[in-house]
Amino acid sequence: MLYVNKPLAILHANCQGEPLVHALLASPEFRRAFAPRVYLNYARQQIPQVDLDACGLFLYQHLGSEWGELASATLLARLPERCPALCIPNMFFRGMWPLWSGAPGFDYRDTLLDHLIDLGLPGKDVLHVYLHTPLAAKYDLAALLDETIALERARQARTPVQYLDFVLEHFRQRPLFHTVNHPSAELIAHAAAGILRELDLAPANPHALAALRTGYEEFFLPIHPQAAQFYGLAYGGENTQYPVYGRTRSFAEYAAAYVACRQAGEHNFIGYLQAAQGSTQ
Protein backbone atom coordinates (compact mmCIF):
# COMPACT_ATOMS: atom_id res chain seq x y z
CA MET A 1 0.00 0.00 0.00
CA LEU A 2 1.48 3.35 -1.07
CA TYR A 3 1.09 6.40 1.13
CA VAL A 4 1.95 9.85 -0.20
CA ASN A 5 2.37 13.00 1.86
CA LYS A 6 0.90 11.51 5.01
CA PRO A 7 2.48 11.61 8.45
CA LEU A 8 3.50 8.27 9.88
CA ALA A 9 1.33 6.58 12.48
CA ILE A 10 3.81 4.32 14.24
CA LEU A 11 2.46 1.35 16.17
CA HIS A 12 5.03 -0.07 18.58
CA ALA A 13 3.25 -3.28 19.46
CA ASN A 14 3.32 -7.05 19.58
CA CYS A 15 1.48 -9.38 17.20
CA GLN A 16 -1.72 -7.41 17.88
CA GLY A 17 -0.31 -4.44 15.97
CA GLU A 18 -1.00 -5.64 12.41
CA PRO A 19 -4.68 -6.52 12.94
CA LEU A 20 -5.13 -3.25 14.84
CA VAL A 21 -3.80 -1.37 11.82
CA HIS A 22 -6.34 -3.07 9.56
CA ALA A 23 -9.14 -2.18 11.98
CA LEU A 24 -7.96 1.44 12.24
CA LEU A 25 -7.76 1.73 8.45
CA ALA A 26 -11.46 0.87 8.33
CA SER A 27 -11.96 4.42 9.62
CA PRO A 28 -12.04 6.71 6.56
CA GLU A 29 -10.68 9.59 8.64
CA PHE A 30 -7.74 7.59 9.99
CA ARG A 31 -7.01 6.24 6.51
CA ARG A 32 -6.95 9.75 5.02
CA ALA A 33 -4.81 11.17 7.81
CA PHE A 34 -2.04 8.62 8.42
CA ALA A 35 0.36 6.13 6.90
CA PRO A 36 0.57 3.38 9.54
CA ARG A 37 3.72 1.39 10.17
CA VAL A 38 4.12 -1.40 12.74
CA TYR A 39 7.32 -2.07 14.66
CA LEU A 40 7.25 -5.35 16.57
CA ASN A 41 8.27 -4.77 20.16
CA TYR A 42 8.80 -8.43 21.08
CA ALA A 43 11.18 -8.81 18.11
CA ARG A 44 13.09 -5.76 19.37
CA GLN A 45 12.78 -4.04 16.01
CA GLN A 46 14.60 -0.74 16.08
CA ILE A 47 12.67 2.39 15.06
CA PRO A 48 14.94 4.63 12.94
CA GLN A 49 15.17 8.21 14.13
CA VAL A 50 14.09 9.36 10.66
CA ASP A 51 10.76 7.57 11.20
CA LEU A 52 10.35 9.02 14.67
CA ASP A 53 11.08 12.48 13.25
CA ALA A 54 8.35 11.96 10.63
CA CYS A 55 5.89 10.54 13.15
CA GLY A 56 2.50 12.23 13.34
CA LEU A 57 0.97 9.72 15.75
CA PHE A 58 2.67 7.27 18.10
CA LEU A 59 0.61 4.34 19.35
CA TYR A 60 2.45 2.07 21.76
CA GLN A 61 2.02 -0.83 24.14
CA HIS A 62 3.75 0.05 27.37
CA LEU A 63 7.27 -1.28 27.85
CA GLY A 64 9.15 -0.65 31.10
CA SER A 65 12.71 0.51 31.65
CA GLU A 66 14.02 -3.06 31.41
CA TRP A 67 13.56 -2.75 27.63
CA GLY A 68 16.35 -0.17 27.47
CA GLU A 69 16.30 1.89 24.28
CA LEU A 70 12.93 0.36 23.35
CA ALA A 71 11.30 1.36 26.65
CA SER A 72 8.22 3.50 26.09
CA ALA A 73 9.62 6.46 28.04
CA THR A 74 12.79 6.41 25.93
CA LEU A 75 10.89 6.31 22.63
CA LEU A 76 8.49 9.05 23.73
CA ALA A 77 11.45 11.30 24.46
CA ARG A 78 12.70 10.83 20.88
CA LEU A 79 9.45 11.98 19.24
CA PRO A 80 8.87 15.46 17.80
CA GLU A 81 7.75 17.86 20.50
CA ARG A 82 4.08 18.06 19.50
CA CYS A 83 3.61 14.51 18.27
CA PRO A 84 0.48 12.98 19.85
CA ALA A 85 1.05 9.66 21.59
CA LEU A 86 -1.38 7.12 23.00
CA CYS A 87 -0.75 4.00 25.06
CA ILE A 88 -2.84 1.22 23.53
CA PRO A 89 -4.01 -2.12 24.93
CA ASN A 90 -1.78 -5.16 25.17
CA MET A 91 -4.56 -7.69 25.55
CA PHE A 92 -3.98 -10.93 27.43
CA PHE A 93 -6.45 -13.30 29.07
CA ARG A 94 -5.78 -16.72 30.55
CA GLY A 95 -9.37 -17.24 31.66
CA MET A 96 -10.32 -20.15 29.39
CA TRP A 97 -6.91 -21.80 29.83
CA PRO A 98 -6.22 -21.96 33.59
CA LEU A 99 -3.40 -24.51 33.11
CA TRP A 100 -1.52 -22.39 30.58
CA SER A 101 2.05 -21.49 31.45
CA GLY A 102 4.44 -19.04 29.84
CA ALA A 103 7.49 -21.07 30.85
CA PRO A 104 10.08 -21.15 28.05
CA GLY A 105 11.19 -24.17 26.06
CA PHE A 106 7.88 -25.35 24.58
CA ASP A 107 4.90 -23.69 22.90
CA TYR A 108 1.54 -23.38 24.71
CA ARG A 109 2.77 -25.01 27.89
CA ASP A 110 0.24 -26.76 30.13
CA THR A 111 1.28 -27.14 33.78
CA LEU A 112 -0.58 -30.40 34.45
CA LEU A 113 0.52 -32.07 31.22
CA ASP A 114 4.11 -31.05 31.86
CA HIS A 115 3.95 -32.40 35.42
CA LEU A 116 2.62 -35.77 34.27
CA ILE A 117 5.11 -36.05 31.41
CA ASP A 118 7.99 -35.14 33.72
CA LEU A 119 6.98 -38.02 36.01
CA GLY A 120 8.00 -40.35 33.19
CA LEU A 121 4.59 -41.95 32.74
CA PRO A 122 3.77 -43.69 29.43
CA GLY A 123 1.92 -41.45 26.99
CA LYS A 124 -1.40 -43.28 27.28
CA ASP A 125 -1.27 -43.00 31.08
CA VAL A 126 -0.44 -39.29 30.88
CA LEU A 127 -3.48 -38.74 28.69
CA HIS A 128 -5.80 -40.82 30.86
CA VAL A 129 -4.82 -39.02 34.06
CA TYR A 130 -4.85 -35.62 32.36
CA LEU A 131 -8.28 -36.00 30.81
CA HIS A 132 -9.93 -37.57 33.87
CA THR A 133 -8.35 -35.75 36.82
CA PRO A 134 -11.04 -33.53 38.45
CA LEU A 135 -9.47 -30.13 37.79
CA ALA A 136 -11.66 -28.30 40.30
CA ALA A 137 -10.42 -30.62 43.06
CA LYS A 138 -6.76 -30.20 42.14
CA TYR A 139 -6.75 -26.47 41.27
CA ASP A 140 -8.57 -23.43 42.57
CA LEU A 141 -10.05 -22.56 39.19
CA ALA A 142 -11.97 -19.56 40.53
CA ALA A 143 -8.78 -18.11 42.01
CA LEU A 144 -6.91 -18.65 38.74
CA LEU A 145 -9.58 -16.66 36.89
CA ASP A 146 -9.42 -13.92 39.53
CA GLU A 147 -5.65 -13.84 39.14
CA THR A 148 -5.68 -13.26 35.39
CA ILE A 149 -8.39 -10.61 35.79
CA ALA A 150 -6.31 -8.76 38.39
CA LEU A 151 -3.20 -8.90 36.22
CA GLU A 152 -5.11 -7.60 33.23
CA ARG A 153 -6.68 -4.77 35.22
CA ALA A 154 -3.18 -3.65 36.18
CA ARG A 155 -2.08 -3.73 32.53
CA GLN A 156 -5.22 -1.95 31.38
CA ALA A 157 -4.58 0.86 33.88
CA ARG A 158 -1.78 2.12 31.62
CA THR A 159 -4.14 2.93 28.73
CA PRO A 160 -7.35 4.96 28.50
CA VAL A 161 -8.67 2.37 26.03
CA GLN A 162 -10.77 0.01 28.11
CA TYR A 163 -11.45 -3.58 27.04
CA LEU A 164 -11.46 -5.88 30.07
CA ASP A 165 -15.07 -5.25 31.09
CA PHE A 166 -16.10 -6.14 27.53
CA VAL A 167 -14.15 -9.39 27.82
CA LEU A 168 -15.69 -10.25 31.18
CA GLU A 169 -19.18 -9.50 29.92
CA HIS A 170 -18.94 -11.68 26.82
CA PHE A 171 -16.20 -14.32 27.10
CA ARG A 172 -18.58 -16.98 28.42
CA GLN A 173 -20.94 -16.60 25.46
CA ARG A 174 -18.37 -16.60 22.63
CA PRO A 175 -14.60 -16.85 22.17
CA LEU A 176 -12.84 -13.49 22.35
CA PHE A 177 -9.31 -14.93 22.24
CA HIS A 178 -7.72 -17.57 20.02
CA THR A 179 -4.89 -17.99 22.54
CA VAL A 180 -3.98 -16.12 25.71
CA ASN A 181 -2.61 -13.15 23.71
CA HIS A 182 -4.33 -13.50 20.31
CA PRO A 183 -7.62 -11.56 20.47
CA SER A 184 -10.50 -12.31 18.14
CA ALA A 185 -11.45 -9.95 15.32
CA GLU A 186 -14.34 -8.74 17.47
CA LEU A 187 -12.01 -7.76 20.31
CA ILE A 188 -9.48 -6.16 17.95
CA ALA A 189 -12.32 -4.09 16.49
CA HIS A 190 -13.45 -3.13 20.00
CA ALA A 191 -9.93 -1.94 20.90
CA ALA A 192 -9.63 -0.04 17.61
CA ALA A 193 -12.94 1.71 18.30
CA GLY A 194 -11.59 2.84 21.66
CA ILE A 195 -8.39 4.14 20.06
CA LEU A 196 -10.35 6.09 17.45
CA ARG A 197 -12.54 7.63 20.16
CA GLU A 198 -9.47 8.72 22.12
CA LEU A 199 -8.05 10.32 18.97
CA ASP A 200 -11.40 11.98 18.20
CA LEU A 201 -11.46 10.32 14.78
CA ALA A 202 -14.43 8.91 12.88
CA PRO A 203 -15.36 5.32 13.72
CA ALA A 204 -14.55 2.43 11.44
CA ASN A 205 -16.84 1.48 8.58
CA PRO A 206 -18.92 -1.48 9.83
CA HIS A 207 -18.82 -3.17 6.41
CA ALA A 208 -15.02 -3.02 6.38
CA LEU A 209 -14.85 -4.38 9.93
CA ALA A 210 -17.12 -7.28 8.99
CA ALA A 211 -14.31 -8.62 6.80
CA LEU A 212 -11.58 -8.08 9.41
CA ARG A 213 -9.22 -10.98 9.93
CA THR A 214 -6.55 -11.13 12.60
CA GLY A 215 -4.11 -13.59 11.06
CA TYR A 216 -4.65 -15.85 14.08
CA GLU A 217 -7.46 -17.90 12.56
CA GLU A 218 -5.35 -20.97 11.76
CA PHE A 219 -4.99 -21.86 15.44
CA PHE A 220 -7.35 -21.86 18.40
CA LEU A 221 -5.79 -23.13 21.61
CA PRO A 222 -8.08 -26.02 22.64
CA ILE A 223 -9.89 -25.59 25.93
CA HIS A 224 -10.02 -28.31 28.58
CA PRO A 225 -13.69 -29.40 28.67
CA GLN A 226 -13.67 -29.33 32.48
CA ALA A 227 -12.52 -25.71 32.42
CA ALA A 228 -15.26 -24.86 29.93
CA GLN A 229 -17.84 -26.47 32.21
CA PHE A 230 -16.52 -24.84 35.39
CA TYR A 231 -16.48 -21.34 33.88
CA GLY A 232 -19.87 -21.80 32.22
CA LEU A 233 -18.63 -21.38 28.66
CA ALA A 234 -21.11 -21.83 25.82
CA TYR A 235 -18.26 -23.41 23.82
CA GLY A 236 -15.29 -25.68 24.52
CA GLY A 237 -17.14 -28.93 25.14
CA GLU A 238 -15.61 -32.37 24.82
CA ASN A 239 -16.62 -32.75 21.16
CA THR A 240 -15.57 -29.29 20.02
CA GLN A 241 -13.29 -29.32 16.98
CA TYR A 242 -10.58 -26.64 16.90
CA PRO A 243 -8.54 -25.28 13.99
CA VAL A 244 -4.94 -26.42 14.56
CA TYR A 245 -2.63 -25.29 11.77
CA GLY A 246 -4.45 -26.70 8.78
CA ARG A 247 -6.52 -29.45 10.38
CA THR A 248 -9.10 -29.80 13.12
CA ARG A 249 -8.52 -31.54 16.42
CA SER A 250 -10.57 -32.24 19.50
CA PHE A 251 -9.10 -31.31 22.86
CA ALA A 252 -8.09 -34.94 23.49
CA GLU A 253 -6.40 -35.15 20.08
CA TYR A 254 -4.52 -31.93 20.73
CA ALA A 255 -3.39 -33.18 24.16
CA ALA A 256 -2.19 -36.42 22.56
CA ALA A 257 -0.10 -34.43 20.08
CA TYR A 258 1.35 -32.37 22.96
CA VAL A 259 2.39 -35.53 24.79
CA ALA A 260 3.84 -37.16 21.66
CA CYS A 261 5.85 -34.05 20.81
CA ARG A 262 7.31 -33.66 24.27
CA GLN A 263 8.09 -37.35 24.66
CA ALA A 264 9.84 -37.27 21.28
CA GLY A 265 12.16 -34.61 22.69
CA GLU A 266 10.90 -31.92 20.31
CA HIS A 267 10.80 -28.32 21.52
CA ASN A 268 9.06 -26.65 18.56
CA PHE A 269 5.48 -27.69 19.19
CA ILE A 270 4.09 -25.24 16.63
CA GLY A 271 6.35 -26.73 13.96
CA TYR A 272 5.33 -30.22 15.07
CA LEU A 273 1.64 -29.37 14.67
CA GLN A 274 2.22 -27.73 11.30
CA ALA A 275 4.16 -30.75 10.04
CA ALA A 276 1.26 -32.98 11.08
CA GLN A 277 -1.18 -31.03 8.89
CA GLY A 278 -1.45 -33.68 6.20
CA SER A 279 -0.70 -36.74 8.33
CA THR A 280 -2.71 -38.90 10.69
CA GLN A 281 -0.51 -37.84 13.60
List each model region and its residues.
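Extracellular glycan-modifying ectodomains
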Residues: M1-Q281
